[in-house]
Amino acid sequence: MRQIPHILAALAVVLLNVPAVKGIFVPRHLAWVYVLVLAFSLTYALMPIVKWTARKLDAVDQPGGRKTHSEVTPLMGGAAIYLGFALVLFLAQDMLLFSQELKGVALGATLVFAIGLMDDIWGLSARIRLVAQ
């Protein structure tokens, strides 16, 4: 029952990539609306997969000390957000103009994602994170 919203999000991703549906957004200059809805749907649909992967890699945050959560909490949520962003850029490349600025944002996001992922899995020190980012 808890998976129904994620399944609906996955169906939305499939539906948004049907050429007839995707074509609705192009002539009306709604490409950014398409990107927003697709990115949200992809990210939401990927979240259970990322949570499962985090548990398998033991990339979890244990409760205790100053932490407010009372259960083991999977890390790596940034992976779902990054994958949603990257997949949308790939899926909507025919609708978007890839300026130098957008390429710079994509490169910067990739670097920050890589450092965040390594931190979630291996627990990097604050100094290493600061230097890398």
Predicted segments — roles?
Residues M1-Q133:
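"…together with the soluble PPM/PP2C metallo-phosphatase catalytic core" -> "…together
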